[in-house]
Every structure is written in structure tokens, then in C-alpha cells.
From Swiss-Prot:
<comment type="pathway">
    <text>Cofactor biosynthesis; biotin biosynthesis; biotin from 7,8-diaminononanoate: step 2/2.</text>
</comment>
<comment type="function">
    <text>Catalyzes the conversion of dethiobiotin (DTB) to biotin by the insertion of a sulfur atom into dethiobiotin via a radical-based mechanism.</text>
</comment>
<dbReference type="GO" id="GO:0009102">
    <property type="term" value="P:biotin biosynthetic process"/>
</dbReference>
<comment type="similarity">
    <text>Belongs to the radical SAM superfamily. Biotin synthase family.</text>
</comment>
<comment type="subunit">
    <text>Homodimer.</text>
</comment>
<dbReference type="GO" id="GO:0051537">
    <property type="term" value="F:2 iron, 2 sulfur cluster binding"/>
</dbReference>
<keyword id="KW-0411">Iron-sulfur</keyword>
<protein>
    <recommendedName>
        <fullName>Biotin synthase</fullName>
        <ecNumber>2.8.1.6</ecNumber>
    </recommendedName>
</protein>
<keyword id="KW-0001">2Fe-2S</keyword>
<dbReference type="GO" id="GO:0051539">
    <property type="term" value="F:4 iron, 4 sulfur cluster binding"/>
</dbReference>
<keyword id="KW-0408">Iron</keyword>
<dbReference type="GO" id="GO:0046872">
    <property type="term" value="F:metal ion binding"/>
</dbReference>
<keyword id="KW-0479">Metal-binding</keyword>
<keyword id="KW-0949">S-adenosyl-L-methionine</keyword>
<keyword id="KW-0808">Transferase</keyword>
<keyword id="KW-0093">Biotin biosynthesis</keyword>
<keyword id="KW-0004">4Fe-4S</keyword>
Amino acid sequence: MAHSS
């Protein structure tokens, strides 16, 4: 999973 905020 890619980092996302």
C-alpha cells in the first residue's frame, strides 16, 4: 500500500 494522508 502506498502512503497517503
